[in-house]
């Protein structure tokens, strides 16, 4: 079969829009839908065909890619799309939906004869736009020739973790990775907040740890967003990070593990969102260290 596919992208937020662009640039026929159509319309300039409904978007699709806010949003969208889907269509489910959410989505796919791939991605706006995401994937071997060109267009690397997407092996790995990302993001914010409170130049702290085991590029990159007031457009937004943090906490609780750091990170993200930072980069959780909205 040709490696040029008809791909439907349902959800054109930060990640979905970038993925749709890269699929089109790779030569695939791309249809896109977003609940707020205006967010999808700029993709038309890249050759993406904008649909009015999920069902319209998935007509004649070889692969459907969902990348929406959460599991319920993905399920609701696929319920709208499924009347137009052919049995055997590959469904690449990249929404971070949590373990229970993935199981529910996989059951829906099974009911309607779809090939289900649990395929969350690692990366934020910049790697998404560059087509350099890491795709974490689990799903049946017999359909991988359909989804591999999609993964190659949006990512630099695909990590397979089994043949049963319903088990959520890829999502489980994503939750572990995100737990680390959230922990270091929260820690960076608190270090900056303490520096401000104590009158310490944070760049002096960066110099202190430079070249040692505590140094990391992520700390510097995220901190600069705060120090230079470059929190928009977000690489990954506070409100989405808060949602993912709660999925991590729930996954731990469901498996008998108490995740105090993830719980604290979730609370910080939620507090920052309530202060007005919901649509800023997740490092804006820095502001949760202060009782009132403050300048960085």
Residue ranges and their predicted role:
Residues 1-66, 89, 125, 159:
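NAD(P)+-binding Rossmann beta1-loop-alpha1 motif at the extreme N-terminus of oxidoreductases
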Residues 96-179:
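Rossmann-fold dinucleotide-binding core
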Residues 168-171, 180, 218-278:
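Interdomain hinge/lid region at the active-site interface
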Residues 130-131, 135-137, 159, 163-198, ...:
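Active-site-proximal catalytic alpha-helix in oxidoreductases
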Residues 276-296:
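NAD(P)-dependent dehydrogenase/reductase Rossmann-like domain
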Residues 54-114:
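Rossmann-fold NAD(P) dinucleotide-binding segment
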């Amino acid at each position: 079969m040709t490696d040029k596919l008809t791909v439907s992208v349902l959800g054109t937020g930060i990640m979905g829009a970038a993925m749709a662009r890269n699929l089109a640039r790779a030569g695939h026929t791309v249809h896109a839908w977003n609940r707020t159509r205006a967010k999808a319309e700029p993709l038309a300039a890249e050759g993406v065909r904008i649909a009015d409904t999920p069902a319209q978007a998935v007509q004649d699709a070889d692969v459907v890619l969902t990348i929406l806010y959460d599991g319920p949003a993905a399920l609701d969208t696929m319920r709208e799309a499924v009347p137009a889907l052919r049995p055997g269509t590959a469904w690449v489910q990249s929404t971070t939906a949590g373990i229970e959410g993935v199981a529910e989505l996989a059951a829906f796919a099974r009911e309607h004869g779809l090939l289900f791939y649990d395929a969350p991605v690692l990366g934020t706006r910049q790697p998404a736009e560059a087509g350099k995401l890491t795709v974490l994937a689990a799903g049946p071997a017999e359909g991988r020739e359909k989804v591999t060109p999609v993964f190659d267009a949006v990512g630099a690397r695909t990590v397979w973790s089994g043949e049963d997407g319903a088990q959520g092996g890829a999502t489980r790995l994503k939750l572990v990775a995100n737990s680390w990302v959230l922990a270091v993001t929260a820690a960076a914010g608190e270090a900056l907040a303490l520096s401000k409170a104590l009158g310490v130049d944070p760049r002096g702290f960066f110099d202190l740890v430079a070249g040692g085991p505590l140094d990391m590029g992520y700390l510097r990159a995220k901190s600069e967003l705060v120090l230079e007031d470059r929190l928009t457009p977000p690489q990954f937004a506070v409100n989405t990070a808060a949602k993912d943090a709660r999925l991590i906490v729930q996954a731990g609780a469901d498996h008998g593990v108490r995740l105090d750091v993830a719980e604290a990170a979730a609370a910080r993200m939620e507090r920052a969102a309530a202060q007005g930072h919901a649509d800023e980069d997740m490092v804006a959780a820095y502001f949760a260290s202060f009782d009132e909205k403050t300048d960085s």
